[in-house]
């Protein structure tokens, strides 16, 4: 069986940002406003990353996240102190995993230990390598399975652009297919073919960006809405996920069973 590489998006795929709304509510004292701020924060976080990439400029994701939070709070009419902004920024280093994640990581740990092939796993994120490493270290679940993932994590900072820029996915493919000495599995040298690189993500923009670059993708559809993104139709190739699953564990099984 071939060696395979599986990349996992971090924020919103492995780690849940749902608890952030509760922290915002504690600070502003209004649950409705807190939900509005949290929703706008994520919206502007992504929008800013896309805009700055389109301008050919790069700044760390933490800087964009902070600016997006200030924008969201201002739009909601809720003043946030410098201390509150800093505290909410730190919340990204204290996120919990989704309930479907640990079983998937346990499956990968078993596969890497007992399987007859090399399964390389990466965290692939808009965050800097340092920020991603901090998030993993502070997560009780991810830190317990840290050995499952290659180090350092794959960050877009290496190419100075954010998802879904094509250069980001080219970087993923280059790293995920690189040979490494001393690897197990049937490949001998640890080499992975381009056709055996997978991305697991809950973000539709990530799906379309990766598929446009020829990467297989399992989309995590926790809301059960089905695939409704239509940008693939605009591109002209009707791009969509390779597979759709309800959680990370199901995604891992789908990928591994594709080679049975």
Regions found by a protein language model. Name each.
Residues 22-23, 40, 67-71, 87, ...:
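Alpha-helical elements of Rossmann-like donor-binding domains used by nucleotide-donor carbohydrate transfer enzymes
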Residues 124, 128-260:
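Asp-based, Mg2+/Mn2+-dependent phosphohydrolase catalytic module
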Residues 1-46:
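Active-site neighborhood of HAD-like aspartate-dependent phosphohydrolases
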């Amino acid at each position: 069986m071939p060696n395979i590489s599986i990349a996992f998006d971090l924020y919103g795929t492995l780690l849940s940002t749902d608890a952030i709304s509760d922290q915002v509510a504690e600070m502003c004292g209004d649950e409705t406003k807190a939900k509005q701020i949290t929703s706008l924060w994520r919206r502007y976080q992504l929008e800013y990353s896309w805009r700055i990439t389109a301008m050919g400029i790069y700044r760390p994701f933490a800087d964009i996240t902070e600016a997006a939070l200030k924008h969201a709070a201002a739009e909601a009419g809720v003043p946030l102190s410098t201390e509150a902004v800093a505290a909410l920024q730190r919340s990204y280093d204290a996120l919990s995993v989704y309930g479907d994640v640990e079983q998937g990581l346990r499956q990968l740990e078993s596969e890497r230990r007992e399987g007859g092939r090399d399964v390389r796993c990466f965290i692939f994120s808009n965050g800097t390598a340092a920020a991603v490493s901090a998030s993993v270290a502070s997560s009780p679940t991810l830190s317990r399975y840290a050995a499952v993932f290659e180090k350092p994590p794959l960050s877009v900072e290496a190419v100075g652009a954010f998802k879904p820029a094509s250069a980001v996915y080219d970087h993923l493919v280059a790293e995920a297919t690189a040979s490494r000495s001393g690897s197990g599995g049937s490949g001998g040298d640890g080499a992975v073919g381009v056709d055996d690189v997978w991305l697991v993500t809950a973000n539709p923009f990530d799906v379309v960006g990766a598929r446009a670059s020829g990467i297989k993708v399992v989309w995590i559809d926790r809301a059960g809405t089905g695939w409704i993104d239509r940008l693939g139709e605009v591109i002209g190739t009707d791009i969509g996920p390779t597979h759709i699953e309800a959680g990370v564990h199901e995604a891992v099984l789908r990928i591994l069973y594709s080679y049975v």
